[in-house]
């Protein structure tokens, strides 16, 4: 818990119970790409009485402070993940919402080459690749990966 207190203070945020609980949930292995609604449901399951409006407000504060990264994947629903030190890209299944993080040096190099060719010095980029799960029929378990 002390690390979370320090992280909040370092980001310029007061340490409050809702912020600590939301940060705790975001650190769970199954919550790498979670929507505000799914995070709220998880808090309810934990017996926490934190309102949905508070969850949205805290996530926006975390986004502004650089604690989380907001992704707007296909379908219009924002999902959040803890900001990571290493860059990664995403594969997203359009059927079940499953999100796979990956890194590929050759893709990164090629993007840099393309930017240089057009006279652009890259400072940041996002790569989202959309498709359908190749193994099995993920539509049977449509909501298994939502927000993750």
From Swiss-Prot:
A Pfam family the protein falls into: FUR
Biological processes, Gene Ontology terms: negative regulation of DNA-templated transcription; negative regulation of siderophore biosynthetic process
Coiled coil: none
UniProt keywords, alphabetically: Cytoplasm, DNA-binding, Iron, Metal-binding, Repressor, Transcription, Transcription regulation, Zinc
Region (DNA-binding): 1-84
Location of this chain's protein in the cell: Cytoplasm
Amino-acid positions noted as binding Zn(2+) in the UniProt annotation, renumbered to this chain: 33, 81, 90, 93, 96, 101
The keyword Cytoplasm belongs to this UniProt entry's keyword annotation: yes
Record-level Gene Ontology MF annotations: DNA-binding transcription factor activity; transcription cis-regulatory region binding; zinc ion binding
Superkingdom: Bacteria
GO cellular component: cytosol
Region Dimerization, residue ranges: 85-148
Principal location listed in the UniProt entry: cytoplasm
Binding annotation for Fe cation: 87, 89, 108, 125
Summary of subunit composition and partner proteins: Homodimer.
Function: Acts as a global negative controlling element, employing Fe(2+) as a cofactor to bind the operator of the repressed genes. Regulates the expression of several outer-membrane proteins including the iron transport operon.
Family named by the database record: Belongs to the Fur family.
Name of the protein in question: Ferric uptake regulation protein
Higher taxonomy: Bacteria, Pseudomonadati, Pseudomonadota, Gammaproteobacteria, Enterobacterales
């Amino acid at each position: 818990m002390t690390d979370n207190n320090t992280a909040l203070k370092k980001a310029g945020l007061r340490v409050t119970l809702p912020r600590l609980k939301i940060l705790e949930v975001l650190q769970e292995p199954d919550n790498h790409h979670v929507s505000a609604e799914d995070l709220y449901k998880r808090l309810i399951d934990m017996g926490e009485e934190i309102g949905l409006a508070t969850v949205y407000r805290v996530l926006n504060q975390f986004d502004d402070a650089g604690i989380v990264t907001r992704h707007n994947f296909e379908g219009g629903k924002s999902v959040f993940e803890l900001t990571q030190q290493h860059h990664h890209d995403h594969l997203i299944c359009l059927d079940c919402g499953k999100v796979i993080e990956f890194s590929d040096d050759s893709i990164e190099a090629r993007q840099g080459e393309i930017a240089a060719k057009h006279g652009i010095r890259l400072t940041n980029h996002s790569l989202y690749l959309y498709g359908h799960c190749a193994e099995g029929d993920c539509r049977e378990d449509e909501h298994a990966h939502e927000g993750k």
